Amino acid sequence: MRSSSPSTGHSTQVPIKVQHRIAKKTTRRRRVDLPCGCSYFVALGCHNHGFTHRGTTHCSSIREWRVYLDGQKSPVFQDNQTPRETISEEPRHNHNTSPIQLQPEESVGDTQMFSNLPNLDSFTSSDLAFLKSI
């Protein structure tokens, strides 16, 4: 039985202009290598957005695109500004380096919510019946 689909040997190749047009429409990204050895890709439309990696905050600014041309050594991009250092993460109110979260110690006695309640022994049987019906 013959296959109803056309053979791949008879298909025509996509013209190079069409391939280029398709490639231009895809999301363009740049690879950025970090000092720790990791790398990430940033889309051209996502510059000036930052993230934290291994305790260091990184920002993908326009100046960072010059990394792939060897930074300040590139003859194409010469500017006399000093490179900004990455911003290290400052201690914050919820920043804790310990993976264990301490819980408040349990105490014996009245809590603030129940301090105004009378002693449970002073409830009458009708009070207890009402509480059970709730």
Swiss-Prot record:
Region of interest: Disordered: 73-103
Predominant place of localization: host cell
Region (Transactivation) residue spans: 119-134
GO CC annotation terms, alphabetical: host cell cytoplasm; host cell nucleus; viral capsid
GO molecular function: DNA binding; structural molecule activity; zinc ion binding
Pfam families assigned to the protein according to its UniProt record, in alphabetical order: Gemini_AL2 (PF01440)
GO term, biological process aspect, one: symbiont-mediated suppression of host innate immune response
Outcome of mutating residue 52 to M: Produces local necrotic ringspots and systemic necrosis in N.benthamiana plants
Consequence when changing residue 46 to I: Loss of suppression of PTGS. Produces chlorosis and mosaic symptoms
Segments of skewed composition (Polar residues): 75-85
unnamed ZnF: 36-53
PTM characteristics: Phosphorylated.
Consequence of changing residue 38 to N: Loss of suppression of PTGS. Produces chlorosis and mosaic symptoms
Location relative to the cell: Host nucleus; Host cytoplasm
Matches recorded under InterPro entries: Gemini_AL2
Disulfide bridge partners, by residue number: none
Keywords: Activator, DNA-binding, Host cytoplasm, Host nucleus, Host-virus interaction, Inhibition of host innate immune response by virus, Metal-binding, Phosphoprotein, Suppressor of RNA silencing, Viral immunoevasion, Zinc, Zinc-finger
Motif placement: Nuclear localization signal: 17-31
Function: Multifunctional protein that modulates host antiviral defenses and promotes host attractiveness to insect vectors. Acts as a suppressor of RNA-mediated gene silencing, also known as post-transcriptional gene silencing (PTGS), a mechanism of plant viral defense that limits the accumulation of viral RNAs. TrAP suppresses the host RNA silencing by inhibiting adenosine kinase 2 (ADK2), a kinase involved in a general methylation pathway. Also suppresses the host basal defense by interacting with and inhibiting SNF1 kinase, a key regulator of cell metabolism implicated in innate antiviral defense.
Subunit structure: Monomer. Homodimer. Homooligomer. Self-interaction correlates with nuclear localization and efficient activation of transcription. Monomers suppress local silencing by interacting with and inactivating host adenosine kinase 2 (ADK2) in the cytoplasm. Interacts with and inhibits host SNF1 kinase. Binds to ssDNA. May interact with host RPS27A.
Domain notes: The zinc finger and the transactivation region are involved in PTGS suppression.
Family: Belongs to the geminiviridae transcriptional activator protein family.
Protein name: Transcriptional activator protein
Taxonomic path: Viruses, Monodnaviria, Shotokuvirae, Cressdnaviricota, Repensiviricetes
